[in-house]
Amino acid sequence: MKSAMLAGVFAITAVLNHAQAATSTCPPAQSIKQTALANGGYRYEASLPDGRTWAGENPLAPASYLADATFHDARYDASTKAVTCTYKGPMNNDASFSVTLKPISGWNLIPIAYWRGTYCEDADIAKCAFTHR
């Protein structure tokens, strides 16, 4: 009887954890806003509906970096609980910037996605989706 109750508790916990998980992707380049930094370069931000913000800076970037950029890769850093997304210019030239979202609780890759460990590279942002709480 106790083992049946314990199994039931584990099943309910698994369902609740799954229900609380959200699926996210890096922000599309079109949703990222850039703001000039005082000493040159730009700050990049994309807001989420829950109030959190993807953010990053490139002190060497000209204004054209955002307009020319497409998604390149995503990586998860367990030590800082952060997901960083990198965007690059045409033909992967030096025009690049990154935005980071942290903290990310309960991060996990999506098995059908293109993640290799904590790194995902594909031109399609959706293929680098991840789950979190």
Predicted regions and their residues:
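Mitochondrial intermembrane space
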Residues: Q20-R133
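Positively charged n-region of N-terminal signal peptides that target proteins for export
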Residues: M1-A7
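Beta-strand-rich domain onsets/edges
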Residues: L16-H18
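Bacterial N-terminal signal peptides
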Residues: A7-A14
